[in-house]
């Protein structure tokens, strides 16, 4: 994987996924063994949208590999504010770093930016498009808790604008998971994702009510309704708060159901779920460090 750009989950085969997840498991078991792996490496962080988990976990991952980061900081304090194009920005920052991580509000921005640089570039979210490293840590969490064999997963919430959903749904086709999509009709999967799933031979099973499928699920992947993606605030208000789960909801679930969420959550998972054995969303976030360490190590020439 050396020097490859990671733009979309669609470019990852089952073998690629297993390689990253196996390497992440090795790192999680003995992180100190990788502490000086990339001591001369600088990772450039270009975040044009807010981020907590993704940005901090990439920072932690690079530093735990012995490297360091160069952070563009906020858009307000950069030359982007003066009108600099994304192409010019990545070309400049490429000269300071050995790899780049980009988050941008425009769908397709990571693919475009990758055409202007020679160092590895990782898409950390391009609008409502893709979020492949979130998908890798999601798959790691699923494999650790439920495994991939005979997996039945429900993906609930904002399926239209949720880039984590778009990435994960395609990646799950590589492990032959049975996928169920739960959302209001106005937030169902976009046509492009439906086409990709159809091309991958995956069935699309849609529900408007979680109760219809909850007892069958091994994993429930919950997402927030993304207010910032709606073109009209009134459209957001129509669907906000429609899908919420609490301890009572989960009474009908399997005892070993795994509940996941890419975070941040708003009100879609009640806090009483946090104390149940179902809740894995905080561990899911923590898994971002070994998974991103593994990906960076492999992209930058690790031995695995």
UniProtKB/Swiss-Prot annotation:
Biological pathway: Pyrimidine metabolism; UMP biosynthesis via de novo pathway; (S)-dihydroorotate from bicarbonate: step 2/3
EC category: transferase
Primary gene name: pyrB
GO terms for biological process, alphabetical: 'de novo' pyrimidine nucleobase biosynthetic process; 'de novo' UMP biosynthetic process; amino acid metabolic process
Subunit structure: Heterooligomer of catalytic and regulatory chains.
InterPro entries in UniProt: Asp/Orn_carbamoyltranf_P-bd (IPR006132), Asp/Orn_carbamoylTrfase (IPR006130), Asp/Orn_carbamoylTrfase_sf (IPR036901), Asp_carbamoyltransf (IPR002082), Asp_carbamoyltransf_Asp/Orn-bd (IPR006131)
Family statement drawn from the similarity comment of this UniProt entry: Belongs to the aspartate/ornithine carbamoyltransferase superfamily. ATCase family.
Keywords (A to Z) from UniProt: Pyrimidine biosynthesis, Transferase
Documented EC number(s): 2.1.3.2
Species: Haloarcula marismortui (strain ATCC 43049 / DSM 3752 / JCM 8966 / VKM B-1809)
Described purpose of this protein according to its UniProt entry: Catalyzes the condensation of carbamoyl phosphate and aspartate to form carbamoyl aspartate and inorganic phosphate, the committed step in the de novo pyrimidine nucleotide biosynthesis pathway.
Positions bound to carbamoyl phosphate: 53-54, 103, 131, 134, 263-264
One MF annotation (Gene Ontology) recorded for this entry: amino acid binding
UniProt binding sites for L-aspartate: 82, 163, 224
Protein name as it appears in the record: Aspartate carbamoyltransferase catalytic subunit
Reaction catalysed by this enzyme: carbamoyl phosphate + L-aspartate = N-carbamoyl-L-aspartate + phosphate + H(+)
